[in-house]
Amino acid sequence: MDFKNFKMPYSINPDYTKKTAYFSMEFAIDQALKIYSGGLGFLAGSHMKSAYNLKQDFVGIGILWKYGYYDQSRNMDQTLNPIWTKKMYSFLEDTGIKFQIEIHNAPVWVKVW
């Protein structure tokens, strides 16, 4: 897959033209995009917001889980019950970028939103 033609949706600040990829398991970017649970996600989200504000050539790379982090409810005995809800990401824009990598000798498809 050739990513050379990918363009940021804003003009890059000439002071920050070095291309940078930020890898994280969590990104707290928006509540609707629930791919975070706490500190790591908020830190990564803050880095993304700062990079956007500075107009850096910067992308975040993480995993978009089908079921994401679970919600919780309380049982009658006050124990916690996990609730796995399939997440809806229809608000994300499809970039059309899709490619295959190999993990432990198995093909895994990667899609970019």
Please identify what each model-predicted range represents.
Residues 1-113:
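Catalytic cores of carbohydrate-active enzymes across secretory and cytosolic contexts
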